[in-house]
A protein has these predicted regions:
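Active-site neighborhoods and metal-handling regions in enzymes and metal-associated proteins
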Residues: 1-169
């Protein structure tokens, strides 16, 4: 979240208080917000669990040659709302070779096909705490070479997680 005052309002406040020195505290606030309490961590985990469950349950309903990107998007949004999510910042569902490198696009009436990937990128919120998940489904049996690439990517993610420690940014 970002909070900004208009320049006009800030000038009025500063003019009305000539003996007070105003200092930009946004960096200090940003740093303080990076540290989460156990309660905040649990809120984030909670919304992530709901988001993950909505994606997985919807993924089980995908039928190649029948399901559209919009069907997938609606299914995820409905399940998230049922789970208690009060806001969805974005919900991207893309499929088909022409859209593999296209992020943050709206779901279309395009029917997903066997042998394709379906990418879901979503952020849901509960009480101001957000999830941010990306998941990929493959419709059919993943080819060997692509499984190997996925395993390599998974190893990179595991190494990055291992390197993460409190205080490291």
């Amino acid at each position: 979240m970002q909070y900004f005052w208009s320049m006009e309002l800030l000038k009025k406040i500063m003019d009305s208080q000539p003996d007070i020195r105003f200092t930009d505290g946004s960096l200090a606030i940003q740093r303080a917000r990076m540290v989460k309490t156990p309660w905040e961590i649990e809120r984030i985990r909670h919304v992530c669990r709901i988001t993950e469950q909505a994606i997985l349950e919807t993924g089980k309903t995908i039928v190649a040659g029948e399901t559209t990107e919009k069907d997938i998007s609606k299914g995820i949004a409905m399940r998230m709302a049922r789970g208690g999510v009060d806001k969805i910042s974005y919900l991207t569902v893309t499929s088909g070779i022409d859209k593999y490198c296209t992020f943050n696009t709206y779901a279309t009436d395009r029917v997903v096909q066997k042998g394709e990937y379906v990418l879901v990128d979503i952020s849901g919120h509960i009480d101001g705490y957000a999830s941010d998940l990306t998941r990929v489904f493959y419709l059919g049996t993943v080819p060997r070479e692509e499984r190997e690439m996925a395993m390599t990517a998974s190893g990179c993610v595991a190494a990055a997680k291992e390197a993460m420690k409190p205080g490291v940014s």
